[in-house]
A protein has these predicted regions:
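Acidic, glycine-rich low-complexity segments
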Residues: 1-140
Length: 140
């Protein structure tokens, strides 16, 4: 990506990628599929990694500040690990099905704390739940 605020979009059928965000506030928008997916977001040194079990997709991210996962249906499990040391400040998880409604499937979100002493706050903000106090804010 170039300098400035950029958005990189991943859709089912795309392969694994390395994303270099560079300057500005950059976002990776990762679109899921209407199947049960396992998504794992973690740190690898100063880089962030998003792994999707369906098709063994790995997104290797540097200088990306926001990761947005749109589930689009299915009984999904999303795990956000300690993102300390990465540039990620916000992880947004949208569990709505295609078209914006619910799909009746049970989703699971697991958030890992950092290696230090954490004071975690869970607050509602309209229709969203915000988790504050971890390495990155998580908005569900």
């Amino acid at each position: 990506l170039g300098a400035g605020d950029d958005t990189f979009v991943w859709d089912p059928g795309d392969g694994s990628d390395v994303v270099e965000g560079q300057a500005g506030l950059d976002t990776m928008d990762f679109n899921g599929a209407n199947v049960a997916e396992n998504i794992d977001i973690s740190a690898n040194g100063g880089r962030a990694v998003l792994f999707r079990d369906i098709a063994a997709i790995t997104m290797d991210l540097n200088d990306v500040e926001t990761i947005r996962f749109d589930a689009l249906g299915g009984a999904d499990t999303v795990r956000v690990r300690d993102l300390s040391g990465t540039d990620v400040t916000t992880v947004r998880i949208d569990l709505a099905a295609l078209g914006g409604g619910g799909d009746g499937a049970s989703d699971t979100i697991v958030l890992d704390a950092t290696g230090g002493d954490d004071v975690v706050q869970v607050v509602t903000d309209g229709a969203s739940i915000r988790v504050l106090g971890l390495a990155a804010e998580v908005v569900i």
